[in-house]
Regions:
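Alpha-helix-loop-beta-strand connector modules within alpha/beta enzyme cores
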Residues: 1, 16-24, 70-93
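Short, acidic/turn-prone active-site loops that include or flank metal/cofactor-
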Residues: 57-58, 118-123
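Catalytic cores of alpha/beta
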Residues: 36-47, 97-113
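C-terminal helical cap(s) of enzyme catalytic domains, especially alpha/beta-barrels
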Residues: 66, 108, 121-134
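Alpha-helical scaffolding segments of alpha/beta enzyme cores, especially the outer helices
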Residues: 43, 76-83, 102, 106, ...
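Glycine-rich, proline-tolerant flexible connector loops at the mouths of alpha/beta enzymes
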Residues: 54-72
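Hydrophobic faces of well-ordered beta-strands that scaffold small-molecule active sites
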Residues: 28-32, 52-54, 92-95, 113-117
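Conserved anion-binding
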Residues: 1-48, 56-58
Length: 134
């Protein structure tokens, strides 16, 4: 708990109000990135959480095919996770690591509510190489 304006610079009453207000608004999201997460996704989603994110690289590695997302096994895993989430009426998220705008609509069509778009190092890498691409 820092000494910031949001917490009243450490003033006890404001700090308590801040904690209670924020605690009521906290949402919980699971990351499904392994065979264990895949196997237990129904149970995980029934635990009063708000949603989940698939980490595709870790999940594909757990399926013994790191970085490959177009296999039947990966697609079946993804469909199982999406279906379990929809049954529990929780938000579905996907971490789209490669910064490809065209993939956003495809993920939305699959039923994802939230898409974490790329990571800074991939965007910097691609942006830095762009002037040299012919």
């Amino acid at each position: 708990m820092g000494l910031a304006r949001a917490q009243g610079y450490g003033e006890n009453l404001q700090k308590q109000d801040y904690i209670l207000d924020k605690a009521a608004k906290i949402e919980i999201y699971a990351q499904i990135e392994s065979m264990k997460g895949l196997k237990n996704c129904k149970e995980i989603f029934s635990q009063n959480i708000n949603g989940y994110f698939i980490g595709p690289y870790d999940l594909s590695a757990s399926l013994n095919n790191p970085g490959v997302f177009d296999t039947d096994e990966f697609n079946e895993a993804e469909a199982k996770i999406l279906s379990a989430a929809k049954q529990e009426n929780i938000k579905c998220g996907y971490h789209l690591v490669e910064p490809e705008i065209s993939q956003i609509q495809l993920l939305q069509a699959k039923g994802y509510d939230m898409i974490a778009f790329s990571v800074d190092i991939r965007m910097l890498d691609i942006g830095a190489r762009l002037p040299f691409v012919k």
